[in-house]
Structures are given as structure tokens and as C-alpha cells.
Amino acid sequence: MTYPTTARTLLGNIEHNLRGIRARVGDRLVLAAVKANAYGHGAAAVSQMIERTGAADWLGVATVEEGLQLRDAGVSLPILKFSPTRDVDDVTRALLAGITLSVVDEASIAQVAAAADALDLSEVAVHLKVDTGMRRVGAEPADAPALAASIAGHPRLRLQGVFSHLPISDSPAGDEFTRQQAALFADTAAAIEAGVGPVELKHLANSGGVLGHPETWFDLVRPGIMIYGSLPDPQAQRTVDLHPGLELTTRISFVKPVAKGETVGYGRTWTAPRDTYVATIPVGYGDGYSRLLSNRGRVVIGGASYPIAGRVCMDQTMIDLGPDPVAAVGDEAVLIGRRGDAEITVSDVAELMGTIPYEVTCLITPRVTREAVD
């Protein structure tokens, strides 16, 4: 028997979102970010769908291991690893698997070049990451032309791409900063191309850039959270119709009467305000359903929304059904998703947790049953 708590990836909705992104950005290439297990949606299933349908042109990962897992799943699309790779064995494994690496300084360039030499590979494509304002990883813009020349000067390397990242493109408060970043990136790319010739792929736009900043689109865009149906920020422009990429459901395991004045759960933090019935569902923070939802989250049962009663436990959570329950053991409980007119979105859960949609889906743990449906 499968674990009754199920994360269901809605591949048709994810494809719809990618089609909407394509329609918005025109003839630019699309790189789908599938790092962190496709933001908790299942990287193999999502990537296989993307390759099968042609919904995107590239995939993006955070680690070499993530890229290798996609290759093991039969995915042959181009894969870009976003951050530099410092481990020699990882560089070698990446090149053997055809994973495109990012470089940020002379050391990372030399490391890829040495691996290419050792493997007798030629025309090994790399992407040079430039820091235009994130202040996290990347070459300084003033240093980028010299680094590009270093890449171009190595007989086994090819500078395929130049890219940067936007820290506040999803918020109107950051519009001017984003425009400044786009201008700096354009100037830096022009300086690079003046020295080494045309660069095939210049890319800057993330989800916020796709939604609200056409000046960031360049040759390729790199959407992330919007692929999976959520806005990167509640204030982000809604310029693409997005459908939810995931449902999280379980089934009621127990129902019992609770008298007015009785308490429920650890710490006795919830007191029944009237005679009621409380349902238990087999999901908790051990499944990635955050304890921050204690006494504030809701679930959908039978097309109606009900509140969490007490603290979310490691493996179970209690729900106040009210004095006249229609629910019974075995009935479905929806933690993320829609039934009838009642809906709980990833963004709803994120707001209650005081976090972002990215974290909500990334928290889902391996013991939750996984399904992927069209």
C-alpha cells in the first residue's frame, strides 16, 4: 500500500505555463529551471515532459548530481549548471555527461580546461557568469572581458554563454535597479563581444524578468517558480496565465468527538470553542508540511475549507470539522489544490508560513508518495 499522502505533479499545467512563457518572450530560447528536484515537483518527470513536448530548450540545475540524475532518466536536452564547480571529479563527470558548466574566474576556467585536456575533448562549451548586482557569485563586470578572452584563448574551450542574475525583478520596488542591471549586463556583453566576437547565448531574465522586464530578455530566459504555477512575489506582474503545478493530498485516518473546553494536540494550544468533531490526517512536518501552519493552516475536505486544530505534529495533523461533520475516515483531504469552489494555493500556504512559494514545495520530503499526471 502506498503512503496516503501524495504529491501529484500536474505536468499538463506545467506545460501550459511554459507555453505561456514562450508566447510572451517571442523567439527567445527558454531554459526551465529544474534544480532542487524541479522546486519539489520531480525533476525527472518534469524534464522528460519538457523534452517530449518541446516546451523548453534548456534545463538548469544547481549541482552536477542533479544533472547526472536527469541524464540517467534519459533526458538529452542541454543542461546548464548555474554555479561554478570546484571539485575536479565533478567537473570531469559533468563533461562526460555533456553538462554545460559555468565559470566565474581564472581558477574555474583552468579547471574546466584541464579536464577537457585530460579527456581529450574539444569545443567544450562554458557560460561565464557575471555579477551585475546580486553580490553572490560571478565575475566583476570590469573583469569579464579578460576572462572571456582567457576562455577564447584556450583551444579546447568555447564561450557559448554570458549570464547574470536578478535579485529584485519580481517587485515594483526594484524596477529601477533591474533596469540598471539590464543596462550593465548589456554593456558588459558588448565589451566581451568586442574582444572575442559574438556570444551565442546572453541571458539574464528569471521569472520576475519574464513577467515584468522585457529589457532583460536577451537571447534566452530562465524562468523558475512561474513554471510551477506561482508568482515569484505577490506584487509581480501577472502577464502570463499560470496554472498550479502540484497538488498535495492525503486521507482522513480518524475522526473523534471533542467536547467544548477540551484541548487538542501537543502543548494544548487549541481549545474546542464548542462541541465538535476533530479529524486526524496522516501528514506532518516529517512530510514537509510545516509546523508553522499550526492553528492557522486550512485543508479542503469535500469541497469545503476547514481549519487546523492545534500543532502540526511530525506525522499527523488535526482538523476541526465542526459540530455536524460530513467527513469520514478515508475521505480525501487536500492540503494544496482545489476541490469545487475551495482552493488552497502554494502561495496561500507560503503566506501563512511567512515564506515564499519556493520553500513550500521544496520542503516536501521523500516519504510522500509521488505521482505525475498529464
Would you name each region that the model predicts?
Residues 2-15, 19, 23, 66, ...:
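Active-site anion/phosphate-binding pocket segments in diverse small-molecule metabolic enzymes
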Residues 5-9, 13-15, 26-203, 217:
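Active-site-proximal beta-alpha core segment in soluble small-molecule metabolic enzymes
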